Regions:
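Glycine-rich phosphate/pyrophosphate-binding beta-alpha loops
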Residues: 167-175, 231-233
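A glycine-rich dinucleotide-binding beta-alpha-beta segment and adjacent secondary-structure elements
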Residues: 105-169, 199-212
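Extended, charge-enriched "interface" segments that sit outside catalytic cores
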Residues: 229, 241, 246-312
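Mid-to-C-terminal Rossmann-like scaffold of FAD/NAD(P)H-dependent oxidoreductases
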Residues: 2-40, 45, 194-255, 261
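Glycine-rich loop(s) and the adjacent beta-strand/alpha-helix scaffold that form part
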Residues: 1-5, 125-126, 130, 183-191
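A glycine-rich phosphate-binding loop feature that marks nucleotide/adenosyl-phosphate handling sites
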Residues: 1-8, 69-75, 136-145, 198-214, ...
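Internal hydrophobic alpha-helix adjacent to the cofactor/substrate pocket in enzyme cavities
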Residues: 177-200
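Rossmann-like dinucleotide-binding core of oxidoreductases
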Residues: 1-94, 98-99
Length: 312
């Protein structure tokens, strides 16, 4: 929708995190990060829901044109109105599509209803009375392979040399597709070169968990990766991803020399600190005094600093 057609004075501002709290995804990012844009939140209302329900049979999702099972974790607005009939409102997040654009994306308002119905129900929302749709919402239905017909390398068992990723494999989501694409592309290249292919066990990564779930369990609806799917989630953390996966990437030719040198430097710092903690002994009296000064329950006795870090 067009930014200038929205009355932001009727919406709730959703500011981003302070710059000081921003954390990059990659250990390689060292450039300063800034939150330059704000998001907003609007809410549907009973009139919005009435318009949607009055036209529900015009939705391909409910009129029989689309028969596939939709995504479980990001349902359309008509799905939410039907499934959660007891709720008198649903949130819609208004997100800028970029730093220098007038396009705003309505997160939580995906729909397959015709454009005239979309215009009607969007304009029933406070702050959206004069909204202009730049590109209407739409629904798609796509086929996928049975993921149990894939090897753990993401190669098809039926068509050798064919590797799949993303929606083709029955998943939903950008990160899920990107991760599978990395693995499938790597293995396709190594297969072409006659080299050993990479299989990631469940305990190594969320990608390993995702692939194992796909090829052993299959899917009934578009698969999304969540921490709750992994029995190893306490050890699969973003702060140790570098240590878990960079050596594997190096072994399989994905990590260049400069990145490997930075990784080794970081590991040497960590190892030096581990040695320092292992060699540091704290007397009981000194430890109790320090903990009491910090407002913590005093330790029963002193010991090696490395072991004291395990204290809950």
């Amino acid at each position: 929708v067009h930014r200038r057609s929205i009355d932001f004075s009727q919406l709730e501002c959703q500011p981003g995190d302070p710059d000081s709290e921003l954390q990059p995804f990659s250990f390689l990012t060292d450039a300063p990060m800034h939150n330059k844009v704000e998001c907003w939140i609007a809410y549907t209302n009973p009139e919005t829901h009435r318009i949607i329900l009055d036209n529900i049979q015009r939705s391909p999702l409910y009129g029989g044109m689309i028969e596939g099972v939709g995504p479980r974790y990001c349902p359309s607005i008509e799905d939410k109105v039907v499934r959660f009939a007891g709720k008198d409102r649903h949130p819609i997040f208004v997100e800028p599509c970029g730093e220098n654009t007038e396009e705003m994306y309505l997160q939580g308002a995906s729909s397959s209803l015709p454009e005239d119905v979309q215009n009607a129900f969007y304009r029933s929302i406070r702050g959206f009375e004069n909204i202009e749709i730049m590109r209407p919402a739409y629904a798609i239905e796509y086929d996928c392979v049975d993921p149990t017909s894939l090897e753990a390398t993401l190669e098809s068992k039926v068509v050798r040399g064919l590797y799949g990723a993303g929606q083709f494999n029955g998943t939903s989501g950008y990160e899920e597709a990107a991760a599978q694409g990395l693995l499938a592309g790597l293995n396709a290249a190594r297969n072409a070169l006659g080299k050993e292919q990479l299989i990631l066990p469940r305990h190594t990564s969320y990608l390993g968990t995702l692939v194992d779930d796909l090829v052993t369990k299959g899917v009934m609806d578009p698969y999304r990766m969540m921490t709750s799917r992994s029995e190893y989630r306490l050890t699969l953390r973003q702060d140790n991803a570098d240590q878990r996966l960079t050596p594997i990437g190096r072994e399989y030719g994905l990590v260049q020399d400069d990145r490997w040198a930075k990784y080794q430097h970081t590991q040497s710092i960590l190892e030096a600190e581990r040695r320092r903690l292992h060699e540091t002994h704290l007397r009981t009296a000194d430890l109790r005094a320090a903990m009491e000064a910090a407002g913590l329950a005093p330790a029963a006795e002193g010991g090696i600093a490395e072991e004291l870090l395990r204290r809950p």
